[in-house]
């Protein structure tokens, strides 16, 4: 299988990431040393799997050991013996007074990225419960975060590193829906799934509030395919799980998984 064979399964804007993973694998082969990736979202991990399996590369994922959405991957020579410390993975716990404050995923991520001055891939999952939140981070950032962050929004917070064994379990249910859509265009799918007007759908997309497979998309005419994950700020996330074909009226019958946070 060549890279061209892999390209056909992904969007053109993902080709650069395909090349990045291919170059990392080549580096490991040339140097006989291992390399650890930054945090990868599920779409990026799917691409990584495709590239590494094509090359016959050996790899380990933190997702084999921790139930998380974002994972880190070790690409290694065949003789490499896994050391969990090589994932460079740390768990930070955030304590705050839930009686007077309410922390959200967005508030936490915005504050941490501001303090770190880095891109999103340095942070993994952010889990929020009443009075407590957790965030997975690259280990090199642990001390800086713990000693620098004292406020998130208006809330006073206390950060501390805790063992990975204390990782919270994500609380999320899946609601399965079957819907009929006139088109696989992004704007029309949002109208169908979210039960909003075409005007509202267009405004959300053009305001950069819609992501497809974790990447912001501002084209209302973006064509969706089976397996795409769509997230809409303020509305949640859903996956086009299966395209069940056309109805007698030549409309698309789709099976959708809608994520519901408890």
Predicted regions span which residues?
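Short histidine
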Residues: 228-229, 238
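A basic, amphipathic helix-loop patch mediating RNA/tRNA/ribosome contacts
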Residues: 177-226
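Ferredoxin-like alpha/beta domains used as RNA- or RNAP-binding modules
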Residues: 1-187, 193, 216, 237-262
């Amino acid at each position: 299988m060549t890279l061209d064979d892999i390209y056909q399964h992904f969007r053109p804007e993902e080709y650069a990431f395909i090349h990045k993973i291919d170059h990392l694998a080549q580096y490991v082969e040339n140097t006989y040393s291992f390399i650890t990736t930054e945090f990868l979202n599920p779409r990026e991990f799917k691409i990584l799997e495709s590239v590494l399996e094509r090359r016959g590369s050996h790899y380990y994922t933190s997702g084999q050991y921790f139930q998380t959405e974002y994972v880190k991957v070790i690409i290694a020579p065949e003789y490499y013996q896994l050391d969990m410390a090589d994932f460079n993975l740390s768990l930070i716990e955030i304590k705050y007074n839930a009686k007077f404050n309410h922390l959200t995923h967005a508030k936490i991520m915005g504050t941490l990225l501001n303090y770190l001055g880095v891109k999103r891939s340095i942070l993994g999952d952010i889990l929020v419960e009443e009075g407590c939140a957790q965030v997975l981070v690259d280990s090199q950032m642990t001390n800086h975060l713990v000693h620098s962050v004292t406020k998130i929004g208006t809330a006073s917070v206390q950060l501390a590193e805790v063992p990975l064994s204390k990782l919270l379990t994500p609380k999320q249910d899946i609601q399965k829906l079957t819907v009929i859509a006139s088109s696989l265009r992004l704007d029309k799918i949002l109208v169908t799934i979210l039960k909003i007007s075409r005007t509202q759908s267009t405004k959300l997309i053009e305001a950069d509030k819609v992501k497809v497979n974790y990447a912001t998309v501002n084209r209302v005419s973006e064509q969706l395919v089976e397996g795409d994950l769509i997230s809409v700020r303020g509305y949640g996330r859903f996956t086009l799980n299966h395209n069940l074909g056309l109805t007698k009226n030549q409309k698309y019958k789709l099976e959708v998984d809608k994520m519901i946070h408890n």
